[in-house]
């Protein structure tokens, strides 16, 4: 069953551009890790909560990532604490239903 990991981060006012630039310039080590399906970084339409969504083939794959040297290296240079207004919130969910693929127009 696919596992979706969401990491909610409250970015402080004035730090949004640096935060986004950091994501756009990263190496995306996770993309090559076994079991990862994809990662998305979502910008808030309202408020200050950015959300990083990572989709995994299994919870075990995610746990291998969090215990790996690659994970440690990917998180070695975090933004300064003042870039955030509160601690991040990590949530794990399993997909139990999804819509069929959307029709494409020709």
Each model region followed by its residue ranges:
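Short, flexible segments with low predicted structural confidence
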Residues: 1-3, 33-34
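An amphipathic, aromatic/His-enriched active-site/gating alpha helix that lines ligand/cofactor pockets
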Residues: 25-37, 55-91
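Short, surface-exposed ligand-recognition loops at beta-strand->loop->(often short) alpha-helix junctions
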Residues: 10-20
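Glycine-rich beta-strand-turn "strand-cap" elements at beta-sheet edges
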Residues: 40-50, 76-106
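Short, well-ordered beta-strand segments in beta-rich or mixed alpha/beta enzyme
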Residues: 3-9, 40-68
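Non-catalytic surface loops within mature trypsin-like serine protease
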Residues: 11-13, 58, 94-97
């Amino acid at each position: 069953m696919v596992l979706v990991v969401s990491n909610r981060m409250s970015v402080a006012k004035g730090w949004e551009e640096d935060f986004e630039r950091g994501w756009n310039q990263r190496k995306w080590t996770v993309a090559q890790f076994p079991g990862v399906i994809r990662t998305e970084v979502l910008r808030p339409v309202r408020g200050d909560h950015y959300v990083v969504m990572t989709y995994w083939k299994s919870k075990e794959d995610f746990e291998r990532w969090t215990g790996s040297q690659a994970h440690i290296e990917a998180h070695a240079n975090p933004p300064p604490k003042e870039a955030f207004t509160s601690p991040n919130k990590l949530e794990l969910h399993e997909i139990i239903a999804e819509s069929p693929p959307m029709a494409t127009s020709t």
